[in-house]
Amino acid sequence: MNDLTKKPILQVLAGETVSPPPVWLMRQAGRYLAEYRQVRSRAKNFIDFCFSPDLAAEVTLQPIRRFGFDAAILFADILLVPIALGRKVWFVTGEGPQLEPFDPRQFEELRLDQTEAVLGSIGETLKRVVPELPDTTTMIGFAGSPWTVATYMVEGGGSKDRFRTRVAAWEYPEAFDGMLDRIADVTAEYLIMQARSGAEVLKLFDSWAEGLPEPLFERVVIRPTKRIVDAVRAAGIDVPIIGFPRGAGTLYPRYARETGVTAIAVDTGVDPAWIQSVLPAGMPVQGHLDPSVLRAGGAALDGEVDRLLDQWAGRPHIFNLGHGITPDVPVAHVEQLLARIRDRS
């Protein structure tokens, strides 16, 4: 059993207020670190990098050694789940992820029988990382939420507006929901494996939840997220789950109430006073510094850190960004951020 008194993030996720708040950053293991780039050069491609427990464990640990973040987050990618579903995924330098576009009407072709075989190495990464962590550091596992994963599968990669996917969700609702269910079921199995391999917290990233009408948001974001949470709990896994429906706007409260997540992560556009007034009482919140101000540094960074610390004071809060850290952020700015937070007491 985890000793909550030693792990500030677990304290917050249990509903406690910790001052100063614990901090970690999305994409904290990444290209802004020279040591990451050195390890990355040893893998022939990004997918192989993710599936190499030795390399993935090393880059997971790098930001902990350098900065002493309160959490390590598993180094992996949300698009490993489509591989387990039987889809091809590859990364093109300068272009990002590429997939063979998938027709949701063929959802029954998606494999449900090879999750452990394909994703088992991710559990091995966790088993390598956990023994190396300081006693106060929490291990976070994660996966992409079904809607966001589906957008990449249907579009064949990244998309500015996910239009093809949204059309498919309206045009073929039964097939589309069947596809989401298959993604959700494999994702749940994947997260259960992560928890059994040492993850103390799980996070679901719905990076493309923005701009959906409420009926569609309910169908493609809330419903499959709840399906995952329910499956994880039914397997006897009781670790906290953080949900991040980025860009959900006024639908954040519904997501928080209806999915069963323990805590909610919010994006940079969310007003702290508003979200505190509409969330379930005492629900922990993670976020939500603008990554651009971290890149800018200086007085602007100090001012934004102070503003967020003031606005979240007295609440169970984990300090993070509202989106992932960018590759061009100077290490000195991360050090400045941490010093500003940790100097508050």
Curated annotation (Swiss-Prot):
Matches recorded under InterPro entries: UROD/MetE-like_sf (IPR038071), Uroporphyrinogen_deCO2ase_HemE (IPR006361), Uroporphyrinogen_deCOase (IPR000257)
GO MF, any single term: uroporphyrinogen decarboxylase activity
Localization (cell): Cytoplasm
Keyword Cytoplasm: yes
Gene Ontology BP, a term: protoporphyrinogen IX biosynthetic process from glutamate
Uppermost EC category: lyase
Coiled-coil ranges per UniProt: none
Site description Transition state stabilizer, residues in chain: D77
Keyword Lyase included in the entry's annotation: yes
Residues holding substrate: R27, Q28, A29, G30, R31, D77, Y152, S207, H323
Pfam families per the UniProt record, alphabetical: URO-D
Major localization listed first in the record, in broad terms: cytoplasm
Catalytic activity annotation: uroporphyrinogen III + 4 H(+) = coproporphyrinogen III + 4 CO2
E.C. no: 4.1.1.37
GO cellular component: cytosol
Protein's pathway: Porphyrin-containing compound metabolism; protoporphyrin-IX biosynthesis; coproporphyrinogen-III from 5-aminolevulinate: step 4/4
Domain of life: Bacteria
Keywords: Cytoplasm, Decarboxylase, Lyase, Porphyrin biosynthesis
Cystine residue pairs: none
Subunit structure: Homodimer.
Classification via HAMAP family: URO_D (MF_00218)
Similarity comment: family membership: Belongs to the uroporphyrinogen decarboxylase family.
Role summary: Catalyzes the decarboxylation of four acetate groups of uroporphyrinogen-III to yield coproporphyrinogen-III.
Protein name in UniProt: Uroporphyrinogen decarboxylase
Protein source organism: Maricaulis maris (strain MCS10)
